[in-house]
Amino acid sequence: MMTHTSAAPDQGKISFGGTNNGLVAKTIKFSGTASHAGGAPHLGVNALNAAMIAMSAIHAQRETYRDQDTIRIHPIITRGGVAVSSVPADVRMETYVRGASIDAFLSASEKVDRALRAGAMAVGGSVEITTLPGYLPIQSSQPMLEIYSRNAATLVGSDGLNRLGHRTGSTDMGDISQMIPVIHPYVEAATGNGHGIDYMVKDYTLGVLTGAKAMAMTVIDLLHENAATGQMVVDKYKAPLTKTDYLSLLRGMMKEESYTE
């Protein structure tokens, strides 16, 4: 059980339930040939152009993604070159590839890899792609949610509760949920945009004290009478993966690929 702050006070004070996207993470290196950008650009191979073409190719794939898969791909360039007067020969990019299911984000990941290779091919350069497992989609334990929601209602009232749908961010709690029962509620104690510079916890009592009380009350209910309720939660949970399955899945997501035109 983990509680996260959020910034949607119009939806209530405590939000819970719902699902999240999973993801893989990629680091990419485009390699070209340096040359004088003004005097002899024709002797260079522009790795920044390869990255730009790759990003355009990634965007061109967006119409192929199903709405229900909620694919999110958001690359950034972390190194664009070393000097304005030199054709960029070493350009670095990072991106996450997110989706509502494992199959969805792995399929999108393959499309991203094609786009990255296409960028390198177009300019006659090369690309190295490293893919790492990120987070898996989350699923919540319904019995735990029922216990938590009753406790949360005593703190903020029934009108202060909000049942979530699907959220397109990702969380490491998703990995845990593939093997054991979890819940991941939110306290709507912040303002601003999530992960933005303006994000700030405005309601400390709600964000820290009330959130902690709701979890503590739920823990007491789960452990009461020799953890009978906790055992019921465990017994009813249908885990998608065993530990062995989980490790095998993550290891299968890890790969390094090099492509040279």
Question: In which residue ranges do the predicted regions lie?
Answer:
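Histidine/acidic-residue-rich, glycine-tolerant segments that coordinate divalent metal ions
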Residues: 1-88
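Metal-dependent amide/peptide-bond hydrolase catalytic core
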Residues: 52-261
